[in-house]
């Protein structure tokens, strides 16, 4: 009867070979080790020269030489396959297979999802063999090909499925494992080659599946043997073991890999074993699982940074309010996506244009005919403004823009003719600041609604000032209050009509986004300061009306238009900065 061993640490070295302990002379060759050192240090040329000098046979073919050079990792370098984490054996010693402890210093990882309760040497039934080949021919054993036979065995699982594979990219087999683990409650263990783990993660990305979210499925990585040269160079071997253990009583092994090409194009074979022989595969899987490592956190983070798992993150829709934070988020999102044309405020602009047209219809015929001379100039200015950004078309027609600009000019002339000094001092600052901000803004065309908004308060101001001439001084003060409110309203409509992102986003550079964000912030700050300045002007005008301008209100002369307009800034400076005059 075979001896029983309670743990993996009690296995003797004789179990590694069925013929007894191996001959050390067959396992180790100093000449070949030195030849490998020459290959890592000097390349293929130095390797061939060393073989000729020592009269050794070429024990490495050209493909193996290239594979070793690709897998070699110099000290301080991170290999693409290693994922910045060493395997279980290489993380504790830096020797080339010269340290064999009788007992491990660390406890092996537990099979946390469960494992069949078979003790060592337990009877598992009579040994049976079933062979399958790909492509399936007339003389192939069994009615199924390799892939169909494997999927049929997976559906018969009741307790556990353990997979050891080099490459795993077949989506059909992965969906079968996922469905079995979710619906039937079967534990699934998957051990993959660390060098080919990225291909498995690519498949998970295509299927919109996160490996860490599966409750009854665990994925870990393994490597082959690791060789350390005297210079510190490390060579990591690959995994060529391929078997699938099912419930501890059946195992499917062979040259078949979990890829579409092996199932349809490549020639492969699959052998299904059952009975007592499965005990050896059970032991081998537990040894490999003890040497395995979880998926590297750096590799997962690199996948997240590259956007491979962005579909798993809940993205909240952006708010439609016109705020600085929303504008910044919208601009960053468009810089990272495909540039496209964005229409902002189209319907609102058309509605406001209709309202603006009804308000500006009160202009006299003389002003209207005099303003038609300026339509060509308005059109030229509009064309120059729209050409600041290539490929952009104006949002409104040329005639509408010219009409609105002329309406605003006519109302401004009415203000200069009728308004008093105090009222003019209240309306100069917002108008100047609005004009300055419009000139600074590049590549942004104001909507018709914003221009109509500029004209509407002006008409209100003209009506209030005309009525103040026929009323007392109290009515004129009310007209000045209405003018200050109208100037603030017109400035707000002009300011918030253009701070949105440009209609064409053609550059992916971050400095463009940063410059536009600073421009929007500067415009909001200027609007805030202009509002404070306008309110201060109004308060100072109300307080100083009884002392400075009482005679001007009562003895207003219609022939002193030029003198009042010339001294307008001086009056404003006296009210704001009396100590510097």
Swiss-Prot record:
<dbReference type="GO" id="GO:0001837">
    <property type="term" value="P:epithelial to mesenchymal transition"/>
</dbReference>
<dbReference type="GO" id="GO:1902808">
    <property type="term" value="P:positive regulation of cell cycle G1/S phase transition"/>
</dbReference>
<keyword id="KW-0597">Phosphoprotein</keyword>
<comment type="similarity">
    <text>Belongs to the FAM83 family.</text>
</comment>
<feature type="modified residue" description="Phosphoserine">
    <location>
        <position position="296"/>
    </location>
</feature>
<feature type="compositionally biased region" description="Low complexity">
    <location>
        <begin position="462"/>
        <end position="488"/>
    </location>
</feature>
<keyword id="KW-0131">Cell cycle</keyword>
<keyword id="KW-0132">Cell division</keyword>
<feature type="region of interest" description="Disordered">
    <location>
        <begin position="366"/>
        <end position="401"/>
    </location>
</feature>
<dbReference type="GO" id="GO:1902480">
    <property type="term" value="P:protein localization to mitotic spindle"/>
</dbReference>
<dbReference type="GO" id="GO:0008283">
    <property type="term" value="P:cell population proliferation"/>
</dbReference>
<comment type="subunit">
    <text>Interacts with FBXW7; promotes FBXW7 degradation. May interact with RAF1. Interacts with KIF22; recruits KIF22 to mitotic spindle microtubules. Interacts (via C-terminus) with DYNLL1. Interacts with HMMR. Directly interacts (via DUF1669) with CSNK1A1 and CSNK1A1L.</text>
</comment>
<feature type="region of interest" description="Disordered">
    <location>
        <begin position="75"/>
        <end position="101"/>
    </location>
</feature>
<dbReference type="GO" id="GO:0005737">
    <property type="term" value="C:cytoplasm"/>
</dbReference>
<feature type="modified residue" description="Phosphothreonine">
    <location>
        <position position="507"/>
    </location>
</feature>
<feature type="modified residue" description="Phosphoserine">
    <location>
        <position position="456"/>
    </location>
</feature>
<keyword id="KW-0206">Cytoskeleton</keyword>
<dbReference type="GO" id="GO:0005829">
    <property type="term" value="C:cytosol"/>
</dbReference>
<dbReference type="GO" id="GO:0019901">
    <property type="term" value="F:protein kinase binding"/>
</dbReference>
<feature type="compositionally biased region" description="Polar residues">
    <location>
        <begin position="88"/>
        <end position="98"/>
    </location>
</feature>
<dbReference type="GO" id="GO:0097431">
    <property type="term" value="C:mitotic spindle pole"/>
</dbReference>
<dbReference type="InterPro" id="IPR050944">
    <property type="entry name" value="FAM83"/>
</dbReference>
<keyword id="KW-0656">Proto-oncogene</keyword>
<dbReference type="GO" id="GO:0016477">
    <property type="term" value="P:cell migration"/>
</dbReference>
<dbReference type="GO" id="GO:0032006">
    <property type="term" value="P:regulation of TOR signaling"/>
</dbReference>
<dbReference type="GO" id="GO:0070372">
    <property type="term" value="P:regulation of ERK1 and ERK2 cascade"/>
</dbReference>
<feature type="region of interest" description="Disordered">
    <location>
        <begin position="426"/>
        <end position="503"/>
    </location>
</feature>
<dbReference type="Pfam" id="PF07894">
    <property type="entry name" value="SACK1"/>
</dbReference>
<dbReference type="GO" id="GO:0051310">
    <property type="term" value="P:metaphase chromosome alignment"/>
</dbReference>
<dbReference type="GO" id="GO:0042176">
    <property type="term" value="P:regulation of protein catabolic process"/>
</dbReference>
<comment type="function">
    <text>Through the degradation of FBXW7, may act indirectly on the expression and downstream signaling of MTOR, JUN and MYC. May play also a role in cell proliferation through activation of the ERK1/ERK2 signaling cascade. May also be important for proper chromosome congression and alignment during mitosis through its interaction with KIF22.</text>
</comment>
<protein>
    <recommendedName>
        <fullName>Protein FAM83D</fullName>
    </recommendedName>
</protein>
<dbReference type="GO" id="GO:0007165">
    <property type="term" value="P:signal transduction"/>
</dbReference>
<dbReference type="InterPro" id="IPR012461">
    <property type="entry name" value="SACK1"/>
</dbReference>
<feature type="compositionally biased region" description="Low complexity">
    <location>
        <begin position="426"/>
        <end position="438"/>
    </location>
</feature>
<feature type="region of interest" description="Required for interaction with KIF22 and function in chromosome congression">
    <location>
        <begin position="338"/>
        <end position="581"/>
    </location>
</feature>
<dbReference type="GO" id="GO:0008017">
    <property type="term" value="F:microtubule binding"/>
</dbReference>
<keyword id="KW-0963">Cytoplasm</keyword>
<keyword id="KW-0498">Mitosis</keyword>
<feature type="compositionally biased region" description="Basic and acidic residues">
    <location>
        <begin position="369"/>
        <end position="382"/>
    </location>
</feature>
<dbReference type="GO" id="GO:0051301">
    <property type="term" value="P:cell division"/>
</dbReference>
<feature type="region of interest" description="DUF1669">
    <location>
        <begin position="1"/>
        <end position="297"/>
    </location>
</feature>
């Amino acid at each position: 009867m075979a001896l029983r061993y309670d743990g993996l640490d009690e296995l003797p070295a004789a179990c590694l070979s069925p013929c007894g302990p191996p001959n050390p002379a067959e396992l180790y060759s100093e000449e070949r080790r030195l030849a490998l050192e020459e290959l890592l240090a000097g390349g293929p040329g130095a390797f061939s020269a060393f073989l000729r000098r020592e009269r050794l046979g070429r024990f490495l073919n050209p493909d193996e030489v290239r594979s070793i050079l690709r897998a070699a990792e110099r000290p301080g370098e991170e290999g693409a396959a290693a994922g910045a984490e060493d395997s279980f054996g290489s993380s504790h010693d830096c020797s080339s297979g010269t340290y064999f402890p009788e007992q491990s210093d660390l406890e092996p990882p537990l099979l946390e999802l469960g494992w069949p309760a078979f003790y060592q040497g337990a009877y598992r039934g009579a040994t049976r063999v079933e062979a399958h080949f790909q492509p399936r021919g007339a003389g192939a054993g069994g009615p199924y090909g390799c892939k169909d036979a494997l999927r049929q065995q997976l559906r018969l699982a009741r307790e556990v499925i353990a997979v050891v594979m080099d490459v795993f990219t077949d989506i059909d087999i992965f969906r079968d494992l996922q469905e079995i683990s979710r619906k039937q409650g079967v534990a699934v263990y998957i051990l993959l080659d660390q060098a080919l783990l990225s291909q498995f993660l690519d498949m998970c990305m295509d299927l919109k599946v996160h490996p860490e979210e599966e409750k009854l499925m665990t994925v870990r990585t393994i490597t082959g043997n690791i060789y350390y040269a005297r210079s510190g160079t490390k060579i990591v071997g690959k995994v060529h073991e391929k078997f699938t253990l099912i419930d501890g009583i059946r195992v499917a092994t062979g040259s078949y890999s979990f890829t579409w090409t092996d199932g349809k194009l490549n020639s492969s074979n699959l052998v299904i074993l059952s009975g007592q022989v499965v005990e050896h595969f059970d032991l081998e899987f537990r040894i490999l699982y003890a040497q395995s490592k979880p998926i590297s956190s750096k590799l997962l983070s690199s996948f997240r940074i590259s956007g491979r798992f962005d579909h798993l993150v809940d993205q909240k829709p952006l708010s439609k309010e016109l705020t600085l934070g929303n504008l910044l988020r919208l601009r960053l999102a468009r810089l990272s996506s495909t540039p496209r044309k964005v229409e902002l405020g189209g319907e609102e602009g058309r509605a406001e244009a209709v309202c603006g047209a009804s308000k500006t219809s009160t202009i006299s015929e003389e002003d209207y005919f005099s303003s038609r001379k300026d339509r060509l100039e308005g059109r030229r200015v509009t064309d120059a403004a729209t050409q600041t950004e290539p490929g952009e078309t104006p949002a409104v027609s040329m005639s509408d823009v010219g009409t609105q600009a002329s309406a605003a000019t006519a109302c401004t002339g009415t203000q200069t003719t009728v308004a008093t000094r105090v009222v003019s001092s209240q309306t100069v600052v917002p108008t100047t600041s609005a004009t300055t901000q419009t000139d600074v803004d590049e590549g942004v065309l104001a909507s018709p609604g914003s221009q109509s908004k500029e004209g509407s308060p002006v008409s209100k101001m003209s009506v209030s000032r005309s009525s103040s001439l026929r009323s007392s001084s109290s009515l004129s003060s009310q007209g000045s209050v209405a003018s200050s409110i109208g100037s603030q309203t017109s400035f707000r409509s002009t300011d918030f009509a253009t701070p949105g992102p440009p209609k064409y986003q053609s550059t992916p550079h971050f400095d463009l986004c940063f410059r536009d964000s600073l421009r929007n912030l500067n415009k909001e700050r200027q609007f805030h300061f202009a509002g404070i300045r306008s309110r201060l002007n109004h308060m100072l005008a109300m307080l100083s009306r009884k002392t400075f301008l009482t005679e001007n209100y009562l003895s207003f002369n219609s022939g002193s238009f030029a003198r009042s307009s010339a001294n307008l800034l001086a009056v404003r400076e006296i009210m704001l900065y009396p100590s510097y005059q």
